[in-house]
Curated annotation (Swiss-Prot):
Keywords: Ribonucleoprotein, Ribosomal protein
Name of the featured protein: Large ribosomal subunit protein bL19
Its job: This protein is located at the 30S-50S ribosomal subunit interface and may play a role in the structure and function of the aminoacyl-tRNA binding site.
InterPro entries (UniProt xref): Ribosomal_bL19 (IPR001857), Ribosomal_bL19_CS (IPR018257), Ribosomal_bL19_sf (IPR038657), Translation_prot_SH3-like_sf (IPR008991)
Family the UniProt entry places it in: Belongs to the bacterial ribosomal protein bL19 family.
Pfam family, one: Ribosomal_L19
Amino acid sequence: MHILDSVDAASLRNDVPEFRAGDTLKVHVNIIEGKNSRVQVFQGFVLGRQGDGVRETFTVRKVSFGVGVERTFPVHSPIIDKIEVVTKGDVRRAKLYYMRALRGKAAKIKEKRDFAK
C-alpha cells in the first residue's frame, strides 16, 4: 500500500488555493481541439467538494443564457491550468445542491465580509 501512497503523493498539485462551497471560482481549463490547444475559463460558484487526496473533485455551477451549467473537475487534474478564487461566499452548508432549484435573487450567495483585526 505504501507504493500507491507514494504515487498518489507525486500526483498532487501544490498550487491549489483554499476554497469551499459557496465561493466563486474562475477555473482555467486547457482545451485540446485537434492540434490546437487553448485555455477556456469556467466561472461559477462551488456546489461542493467530494473525496480526498488525488481523487478529490469539486463541482462548479454557473447560469449561461438562462440555462444552468454544472461541471465537475478533479482538483489535481493536469487539464486545469489554474484556479482563481473571485469571491468568498457566506454559506452554512458543505453541499449547496438546493441552489439548483432557486431562481433570480434567491439564487444569490452572500459575500463573506472580512473584518480587520
